[in-house]
C-alpha cells in the first residue's frame, strides 16, 4: 500500500511540475542520442516519455494498461486493472522483456525511480530557462 501510494503521489508530483513549466517546448539542452534513441529535452518530451512507460512497466507483470489522459490518471487505471486480479498481492515474479525478472514490488520501485530521474532533468532544464521562482518543485530538489 505504501509503495502504491508513493507511485501515485510521484505521478501527481510529476504532473504538478510539468504543469508549472511556462513553455512545455522550450529547452536548454542540446540534441543527444543514446542507444535507446533521442534523449527527451523539452518538458513535453520528458512528460510524454515518463507517462508512456506506464504501459511498459505494467505489461512486465502481465497487467493491461494504457497511457491515455494524464500521467496520474493512466497510472491509477493501471493499478485498478492490477487490483482486479485476486492474486495481485502474491508478488509473483515474471520473466519480462529481455529475460529480466519483474514483480509488483519492482514495478512500484521503478515507477518512483523513473519519475524522479526525469523530474530532476525537467526541473533542472526549467529553472535554467525560466528561473526557480517560475517552476514548482514538488520533488524538493
Predicted features along the sequence, with ranges:
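Short, contiguous alpha-helical
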Residues: 24-72, 97-141
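Acidic/histidine-rich alpha-helical segments that form the ligand environment
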Residues: 1-20, 65-97, 102-121
Amino acid at each position: 500500500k505504501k509503495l502504491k501510494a508513493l507511485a501515485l503521489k510521484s505521478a501527481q508530483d510529476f504532473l504538478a511540475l510539468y504543469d508549472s513549466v511556462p513553455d512545455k517546448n522550450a529547452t536548454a539542452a542540446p540534441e543527444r542520442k543514446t542507444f535507446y534513441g533521442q534523449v527527451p529535452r523539452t518538458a513535453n518530451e520528458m512528460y510524454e516519455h515518463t507517462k508512456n512507460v506506464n504501459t511498459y512497466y505494467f505489461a512486465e507483470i502481465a497487467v493491461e494498461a494504457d497511457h491515455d489522459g494524464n500521467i496520474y490518471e493512466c497510472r491509477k487505471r493501471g493499478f485498478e486493472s492490477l487490483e482486479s486480479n485476486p492474486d495481485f498481492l502474491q508478488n509473483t515474479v515474471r520473466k519480462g522483456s529481455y529475460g529480466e525478472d519483474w514483480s509488483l514490488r519492482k514495478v512500484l520501485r521503478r515507477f518512483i525511480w523513473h519519475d524522479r530521474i526525469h523530474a530532476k532533468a525537467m526541473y533542472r532544464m526549467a529553472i535554467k530557462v525560466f528561473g526557480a521562482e517560475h517552476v514548482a518543485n514538488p520533488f524538493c530538489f
